[in-house]
Amino acid sequence: IEIESNKREVKKWYQPIIKGSKLAFAGFIIKEFNKTEHYLCRHILKPGSKSSTFTCTANTSNLDTYKYNIDLTISQKKIIHKYFMNRRSNILYNNILSDEGGRFFHSQIRYMACKLKKDENINLPKNYIWLSKNQIITLIDEQKIDIEARLLFGIVNFKGII
């Protein structure tokens, strides 16, 4: 589409609008250790990136077909099913937002956060780690947390600062 703006260095340009899947997913599992909330994060290397980053506990580009997605590990599929699709889970946040502010045509992401009970444990799959709030903030400063995880982390913690 053609874009015109008097608020940018370039006044006119053509912006590609990418059609993604209708509903993607990003979710955090949260658990308290030693009176401090920790977030279960996954260590990843995204295509085109020079260095690795951390992301949410679970992500998929299409929530409707996650069970059949060959790019998701069995562990990721089990996590989505057990903690985010289970009505008995302690869901702290569940909302649908436009993907990257509407840059992707009619594409949305369901963001969810689930808090484990104190006595509830999870077997950590390969590349997973529990990170505290302070560790995540430090990693955000170092640009080591991806956009979905930054957004969900901010949303989950926003109500605590107002």
Indicate residue ranges for each PLM-predicted region.
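Generic structural hydrophobic/aromatic packing signal, biased to beta-strands
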Residues: I1, Y39-C41, A113-K115
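Extended, Lys/Arg-enriched charged tracts that mediate electrostatic binding to polyanionic substrates
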Residues: I1-L23, G27, Q76-L97
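Core of folded catalytic or high-affinity ligand/protein-binding domains
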Residues: N6-S49, C56
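Sequence-level detector for tyrosine residue identity
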Residues: Y14, Y39, Y66-Y68, Y83, ...
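General "foldedness" signal
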Residues: R42, S51-T55, Y68, R150-G154, ...
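Compact, glycine/acidic-enriched structural inserts
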Residues: P47-I91
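Elongated scaffolding segments in large macromolecular assemblies
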Residues: N90-I162
